[in-house]
A protein has these predicted regions:
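Short, well-structured beta-strand/strand-turn elements
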Residues: 134-146, 271
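Short, solvent-exposed loop/turn and secondary-structure capping segments
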Residues: 42-43, 62, 83, 102-105, ...
Length: 394
């Protein structure tokens, strides 16, 4: 009997998969891997071709065509989202820079699946939009798109600019790998506070005795001098964060305004993982430059609404840096000033954004739910309405 039921479930999934098709309301990206090879690795790129059919939708242009596809490489990406779902996220590297769907020219993009987003695909969408609204220095651009991989419709995806050092993204000097010149290692850093220990990183012990992981994105390979510099910098920040809360010394090394804006965005959406993983910050070249928090990235843990009043008070994740930072009166005064101004003059516009997203995504979300019935967002109106309710209580 169990085998029979399993067979029925398999056949249902197969029939559903084959029956699902793109909605025709969003551009469609066609990807063909070499020899139809399956994408099974996050480490190794596969050769592939692609083209984007804009379907005549206003504001978008075709890229390549079925008869003249363009070259690219593709691999898996993500951690839990890669392991935990059949609908996979991907990282793509184009052979030539392209302005995909009106975004700045680049070779580097992600196709985010958001299979874990049961809030109407709004977790990242709202988080990114709030980041733009509140004035973060750069926020990744996103375009919803439907994807056909090796002839198979795989649903609604979000074509997203990846975080990298670039004049159109994190606009700082790019520090060379294995640099040894003391004057050149003071900046050009892009670092992530990470909750995974599977990428090149350094670790320090926090003031509370917990270990904190810093994955360095740029540079990617460190000399002894670079590793020493980064370790010293993170140790100094940690010491100051756990030090005298009435001292202003921390703000000589950290951009208080950027951190306050970053923090407010995370609080609005109740992203309880925000200072534990996918927490990016960077430092420009120069002896007196400061560490700047941002850009925002992963809002997969947003809108869960823990019982804690503030994100750092929840027990789901270890986020003691922000918990300590919020004890600094000067920081909280700056947060209140930005929040009051933002709330009075701009915050209500987020509801126009969610309304527009509902209109834009509804039919594609239905097609996606047909393709992935286990974790789709078929009733988009109900789910986005819930997000609006949560935003009103932020």
């Amino acid at each position: 009997m169990k085998r029979f039921i399993s067979l029925l479930l398999f056949l249902f999934t197969l029939i559903t998969s084959n029956a699902a098709s793109y909605s025709g309301t969003l551009p469609v990206m066609h990807i063909q891997t070499k020899n139809n090879a399956p994408i099974v690795s996050k480490e190794d790129y596969l050769e592939a071709t692609y083209y984007i059919d804009a379907l005549g939708i206003s504001g978008y242009q075709n890229v390549g065509s079925a008869t003249t596809p363009l070259s690219m490489e593709i691999k898996g990406r993500g951690n839990w989202t890669w392991r935990g779902f059949d609908k996979k996220p991907y990282r793509i590297k184009l052979s030539d820079k392209q302005p995909l769907l009106g975004m700045n020219k680049s070779k580097h993009f992600a196709l985010l699946a958001h299979a874990d987003d049961n809030k109407g695909f709004m977790r990242n969408a709202v988080g990114f939009e709030l980041s733009r609204m509140i004035g973060m220095k750069w926020t990744p651009e996103v375009r919803p798109i439907e994807v056909i991989l090796n002839g198979d419709y795989i649903g609604l995806y979000f074509l997203t600019e990846t975080i990298r050092v670039d004049k159109d993204r994190v606009n700082i000097v790019e520090q060379e790998d294995e640099e040894t010149d003391a004057d050149k290692i003071t900046g050009g850093w892009l670092v992530e506070i990470d909750n995974y220990d599977d990428s090149p990183n350094i670790k320090i012990t926090e003031g509370c005795g917990e270990e904190i992981i810093f994955t360095y994105k740029t540079p990617e390979i460190l000399s002894v001098q670079q590793e020493q510099f980064l370790t010293q910098e993170m140790t100094r920040l940690n010491t100051l964060i756990y030090g005298d809360k009435h001292s202003d010394e921390l703000w000589q090394y950290v951009d208080i305004d950027a951190l306050a804006r970053f923090y407010i965005v995370q609080e609005i959406v109740d992203n309880y993982e925000s200072f534990h993983g996918s927490c990016y910050f960077y430092r420009e070249l120069g002896e007196n430059e400061k560490w700047t928090f941002g850009p925002v990235w992963d809002f997969g843990s947003a809108f869960f609404y823990s019982k804690a009043q503030y994100i750092y008070q929840g027990r789901e994740h270890h986020m003691t840096w922000i918990g300590e930072i919020c004890k600094f009166p000067r920081f909280m005064e700056h947060v209140k000033k930005i929040w009051n101004n933002f709330y009075d003059s701009q915050f209500s516009a987020i509801f126009n954004f969610t309304s527009n997203q509902l209109t834009l995504l509804s039919k594609a979300a239905s097609s996606d739910a047909q393709r992935w019935p286990k974790y789709g967002n078929a009733n988009l109106s109900k789910r986005i309405s819930k997000v609006n309710d949560l935003l009103r209580t932020s």
